[in-house]
């Protein structure tokens, strides 16, 4: 009887396992992360607030200056920070912005201001992942300003040693910073803890934008002289790969699982999805004119791409890389930020 019972138990175990193999997984997908998508509408000198679930821009907040290109949202999702850059593009003649607007998202009003004391063309604002400080590129100072968001005081700076330090990425541990220096075509490597420059990585004659892999081991920037993406090893500071693109790349963002890099291909009105395991483009998606910046939602389910010339933001599903919806934004839609709720 004991032997028969053992056979019966073994049979039932296999039967249940086989049934589980055949039965589809009926578990409900994770609900989408709640929050607002913030967009810098350069043409109206205002920050747009998009409700992603409704698929529309529900408000605009005047920034009070000419003009914000990028946005940072506070970790608690209550406040937005918009550096006021000026009326020109990077390296071009024009006005030199000297302040950053602070916007309360609940009241949708400007509630604070950071004055840099002179025209510095403040551009990209990034929260430190560990220290809670707000870091802002100040191009004309060849530096990154360190701001305490609680007091709105400038408490330090990190020199980049290069002109046109336009965009900033910070490693997940908060120890290293990397700036994309457009005109020189270089990347500055920064010691964020000791607030000093560690070196410069030459990439091309001109580059745009910068992003890191989720583990901080790879740096990505788009060559502006050839349709290719530079992949740089952050430890050796050497170019590891050049990935061909269907046009000149621009903004990039990695998915939270570390598998994909989403690349705006500005000159081709497309988005390229790079497989980071194979280091090659796996998907190409048509989007409206002049895709600029890419933001992957924290839950990884959606990628948002601002499209400057078309007043649109494309929402792209990461499950099948299809365009979920096109959201009407403002003219010159550029910088993006996610304000979680």
Please state what every model-predicted region is:
Residues 1-8:
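Positively charged n-region of N-terminal signal peptides that target proteins for export
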Residues 12-341:
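Predominantly soluble domains enriched in secretory-pathway, periplasmic, or organellar proteins
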């Amino acid at each position: 009887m004991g032997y028969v019972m053992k056979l019966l138990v073994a049979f039932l175990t296999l039967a249940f396992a086989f049934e589980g193999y055949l039965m589809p997984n009926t578990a409900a997908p994770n609900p989408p992360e709640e929050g607002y998508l913030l967009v810098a509408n350069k043409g109206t000198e205002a920050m747009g607030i998009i409700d992603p679930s409704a698929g529309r821009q529900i408000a605009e907040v005047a920034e009070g200056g000419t003009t914000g290109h990028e946005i940072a949202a506070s970790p608690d999702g209550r406040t937005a920070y918009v550096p006021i850059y000026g009326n020109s593009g990077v390296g071009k003649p024009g006005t030199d912005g000297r302040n950053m607007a602070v916007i309360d998202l609940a009241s949708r009003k400007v509630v604070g201001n950071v004055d840099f004391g002179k025209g510095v063309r403040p551009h990209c604002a990034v929260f430190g992942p560990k220290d809670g400080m707000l870091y802002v590129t100040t191009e004309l100072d060849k530096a990154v300003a360190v701001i305490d968001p609680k007091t709105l005081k400038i408490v330090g700076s990190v020199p980049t040693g290069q002109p046109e330090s336009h965009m900033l990425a910070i490693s997940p541990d908060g120890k290293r910073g990397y700036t994309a220096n457009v005109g020189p075509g270089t990347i500055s490597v920064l010691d964020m803890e000791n607030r000093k420059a560690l070196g410069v990585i030459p990439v091309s004659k001109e580059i745009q934008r910068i992003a890191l892999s989720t583990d901080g081991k790879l740096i990505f920037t788009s060559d502006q002289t050839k349709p290719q993406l530079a992949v740089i090893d952050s430890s050796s500071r050497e170019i590891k790969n050049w990935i061909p693109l269907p046009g000149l790349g621009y903004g990039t963002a990695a998915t939270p699982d570390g598998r994909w890099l989403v690349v705006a291909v500005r000159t081709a009105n497309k988005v390229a999805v790079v497989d980071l395991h194979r280091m090659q483009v796996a998907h190409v998606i048509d989007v409206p004119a002049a895709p600029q910046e890419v933001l992957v939602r924290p839950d990884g389910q959606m990628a948002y791409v601002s499209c400057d010339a078309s007043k649109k933001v494309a929402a792209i599903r990461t499950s099948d890389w299809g365009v979920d919806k096109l959201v009407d934004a403002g003219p010159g839609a550029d910088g993006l930020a996610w304000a979680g709720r």
